[in-house]
Design a protein with these regions (language model features):
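Sensory modules in modular signal-transduction proteins
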Residues: 1-23
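PAS/PAS-like sensory domains across diverse signaling proteins
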Residues: 24-26, 36
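N-terminal capping loop/helix in small sensory signaling domains highlighted by a polar->aromatic N-x2-3-F motif
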Residues: 31-34
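Terminal output helix/cap of sensory domains in signal transduction proteins
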Residues: 42-91
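PAS-family sensory domains
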Residues: 69, 88, 99-102, 109-121
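PAS/PAC sensory module
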Residues: 82-86, 93-99, 115
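Sensor-regulatory modules in signal-transduction proteins
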Residues: 104-106
Length: 176
């Protein structure tokens, strides 16, 4: 593949979300699978680091786009691996995913941007959250401390709700 058009056609044909950014993190390209995954069309040159509407950690904390794995890869100019995040679409549905942000360098070795591939891991994440809820319920049954019991009940409820929310969103892509 010798031209940018060849590369673009190849990325467009992929059934998984892929997008690129420039060296400052502005989104410069995305394939159709990205739009389906994110539930929105990114704004060229406006969106930075991510194609998603909102992000959360797996523990339910908001994850600012400026702190997402792609932003980290751009800041450090190195691959970021072994992360999972939760994408929230404009319709409120959620997808858990593993990103694979990878820096891009020109022929002269200068950093030019990054590419990111997103793998939907919602079902696996929902199973892990359901197991955490079950673990909290078992611990709750074993404790005699009322305060600990209340905390464990709340934790179990949160894990179960997050698992249910991931399962209610129809998967777009399955991990290989």
């Amino acid at each position: 593949m010798s031209s940018a058009g060849d590369w673009r056609a190849s990325l467009d044909a992929l059934p998984v979300p892929v997008y690129t950014t420039d060296a400052d993190g502005a989104v410069t390209y995305w394939n159709r699978a990205c739009v389906e995954f994110a539930g929105r069309e990114p704004e060229l040159g406006q969106d930075r680091w991510c194609v998603t509407w909102q992000l959360y950690t797996t523990s339910g904390e908001p994850l600012p786009h400026s702190e997402c794995p792609m932003a980290e890869a751009i800041r450090t100019r190195s691959e970021v691996r072994d992360k999972v995040a939760i994408a929230v679409r404009p319709d409120g549905s959620r997808r858990a995913f593993t990103p694979y942000p990878t820096p891009l360098f020109g022929k002269d070795g200068a950093f030019v941007g990054a590419v990111n591939l997103l793998i939907d891991v919602s079902e696996e994440q929902a199973e892990a959250l359901a197991e955490q809820a079950s673990r909290c319920r078992r611990l709750r049954q074993a404790t005699t401390d009322p305060q600990a019991a209340q905390i464990l009940d709340e934790m179990a409820k949160g894990y179960a709700e997050n698992a249910a929310a991931l399962r209610q969103s129809r998967p777009v892509f399955k991990a290989a």
